[in-house]
Structure formats: structure tokens, C-alpha cells
């Protein structure tokens, strides 16, 4: 059934380190592939990391670090947005008391339709609440240090982050969103939500540091002067689209691939700054 699939998890790791007196480097790669026991749910992630430390001369240093991750998630679970039905409190006892009928549990409810009671095949419910998400994250940081003269050091640092997220949601015929859509013309039809988010961040820091230990010849006192500035630039663009009214035969893969066959019901475009 829903949680009856045989799951497995694969992990692969690779690490390489080395260097000399003036240069040190390290590289690592990690991969995880998780097939969950819940039908339709999977998780996959790849991580890359590179680190480099060098000393080109007696008074200079260069540091560099790069990281990249790619994460893919599949499956939204058999979740419903909200709603309370007279079956909710008794379904948890279905295994213990299987003789209790699920239709028409009390005289106040005269409906004998499982859809009115929010009772669906769990495998169908999982397929009708599907999701496919991919996140990519790239980070790069570097630093340059220069000892201009004894006790006087200049250092500049920079960092760059780039993040993307693409989230596709599908709500099938048994989902709360499809059954209770406000516009009755599109109710009881599959719908999808597409969320695309892109963020960029750049940081730069410049500092100069002077140690007055040669002027203050006292081991009990320390005086340093640090001057510098930092600026950060951040940009973001997020676009969300909801498309409704797909043919009832469309599953998640078909609706995502043929999004033009639906009707656009809402669009959100967010820019910062």
C-alpha cells in the first residue's frame, strides 16, 4: 500500500586532500540517493566542495572555497489541506475494529458517497498530491591577505551565492484543492502550481589592521586598530503561477509537461530590490 514499498538509501563519498609547504587543497564529493518506503517519494542530493589555501610569497596569502549542491525531491505525500469529517476520529481504529463500516457512520450524515466522507484510495491520494522540487545552490568565497609592512596587514574578501528553486505541485481529483476550488467551472479538475525562485548575493569586505605592540612595550596591554568597509548586494526574483482546469485524465507528469492545456488563474511576480 502507501508505505509498503521497499526503500533503500545509497551514500557515496569521495575526498581528496594534498599540498605542499605553500599550497594546500582539498576536494570532496558526496552523493545520497534515498528511495522512501512511501510510494512516489524520493530524495537525491549531490554536494561538491573545493578548498584552496596558498602562500604565493612571504607576505601574501590567497584562500578560495567553492561549494555546489543539487537537491531533488519527489513526492508531496497523501496530505489534505484541511477539513474535518465524521470519519476522521474513527479511521485510526479501523485496524483494531475492522467491522465498523466507513459509510454513513451516523444518522446525521445521510451521504453514502466516499468522496463526501473524504475517503479515498491512499495510493490515488498520494498520486493526486504530487510534488517535484529541485534546489541548486552555488557558493564561492575568496580572500587575499597582504602584510604591507611589519604589523600592518591588508585583507580583502569576497563572496558570491547563487540559489535557484523550481517547485512543481500537482493536485489531482481527490485533493482538497481540486474538490473545493472556488470557481465551480474548474472545480473537480486537476490543477498545478509552479514556483520558480532565483536569488543572488554578492559580498565584499576590505580591512586594514595595525598592531601597536611595538609602540606599547607592555605584555599586559594590547592595542589594535582595524579600519574597513563591507557592502552586500542581494537580488531575488520569484515567479508563482497557478494553472487550473486540466482534463480529468491528466496525471502530474502530463499536467507539468502540457501546462498550456490548462487555464491560468493566478500569477505572482516578486522582485527584490
Predicted region positions:
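Residue-level signature of outer-membrane beta-barrel architecture
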Residues: 18-20, 31, 54, 144-146, ...
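Surface-exposed loop/interface segments of Gram-negative outer-membrane beta-barrel transport/assembly proteins
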Residues: 1, 36-41, 47, 51-139, ...
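Short strand-turn segments of transmembrane beta-barrel domains in outer membranes
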Residues: 1-15, 28-41
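Short coil-to-beta-strand
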Residues: 21-25
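P-loop NTPase catalytic cores that bind/hydrolyze ATP
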Residues: 140, 146, 150-154, 158-159
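Structured alpha-helical segments in the cores of large, soluble enzyme domains
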Residues: 12-18, 269-273
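Periplasmic plug
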Residues: 26-28, 63
